[in-house]
Amino acid sequence: MKIALDSTYSVGADLSGVGVYSREMLDGLARTHPADRFAFCYRPHRFLRSFGERLPANAGRFLLGETRAPRSADVFHGLNQRLPHARLRRAVTTFHDLFVLTGEYSTPEFRRRFAEQARDAASRSDRIIAVSQFTARQVIDVLGVDQARVRVVHHGVRPPGGTAVTRQKIILHVGAIQYRKNISRLVDAFERVDRDWQLVLAGSAGYGAAEIVAKIGAARSRERIRMLGYVPPAELANWYARAMIFAFPSLDEGFGMPVLEAMASGAPVIASDRSAVPEVAGDAAWLVDPEDTEELTGALVALTRDPERRADLSRRGLERAARFTWAEAVEKTWQVYRELADGRPD
C-alpha cells in the first residue's frame, strides 16, 4: 500500500502539538510497515526546510500544493484538518479541535479561513480521525459529518526524558498565552497561593496575549510569575520534572496533550472539567470548573499544602499516562487505512 501524508507541520525543532502528532505518525507508520511506501508531502513554505529531516528508507519527499498531491497514493492523510484541492483516491483527515468555530478565541479572518478548510476536508474525507470522543462529537454536530465515517484515535505520550531533579514549589502551565487557556483566572487564583510558590508559564504568545501579559504585570504576585515563551521539548521535560503541581484550567481543548505529558512526568495535575480534558485525565487529576475562580483557587491552595494528595495524584497520573501510547495510535491509524484500501463500508 502507498500512503501519502501532509507532513508540513512535522518540520523543525519548535513543534506544536500538531507537529508532535505529525512526527509520531510519520515515524511510527514508516517504521512499523517497512514493506509499504510513504510519500511525506510538504507545503511550499516548509518544503525546503524538510530537507533537514532524515526520511525513512521507505518514504519519499513530495512538494504539496493546493491542487497538487501524489496521484498514485492509495490513501492521502491530512494530518491537520485540511486537504489539498487535488484528485485523491481515498482521503483521511485528522481533526484535532474545533474551538475556532465554537468560541471567541481567534480573529474573524482566521475563523473564516479555518471554517472553509475544515468544512471542505470534512465533506471530502472518506474517513475522519478525531483525537478524542469530544472532538468526534463536535465533528458530527458542528460539521454535520455522518458518524459512520468518524474514528477516534487518542494521542499517545512518550516517557519523559528530563533530567532527574528535586521538585520545587512551582506551579507549571504549558500552553500558548491566549484567552482559551484561561491564564487570567489562573493568575487570579495564584494570587492567594502561599508566597514561597512560583507560577511558571511555558508557551508562545497567542490570541489575546497582550491583555494577559498586562494582567500579569499588574498582579500583586508578578515577582513570582515567570513567562518562559516557547520552550523546546528537552527543556520542557526538565520543567515538568521540577514542577510540584501542573495547572491546566483551559476553557476548550480537543485533547489536552500537556495533561498527559505532566502525568507521565509524575507531576500532580489540576485541570479543567470541560471539553476533552476529563476524557484524557480520567480520575487521575483534580478537575475544576475553569470559569469558577474560587474553585480553582481552592484547589491550588489545598494542593500546595497537601503533600499526601500530591503523591496520590502523581501515582494515579503515572498509571493513567501509561495507557496512552503512540504505538497504539499508529496501529489504529493504520487500521483506518486498511478499511479504505479493502473497500470496507462505513
What are these regions, as identified by a protein language model?
Residues 1-346:
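Carbohydrate transferase catalytic cores enriched for Leloir-type hexosyltransferases
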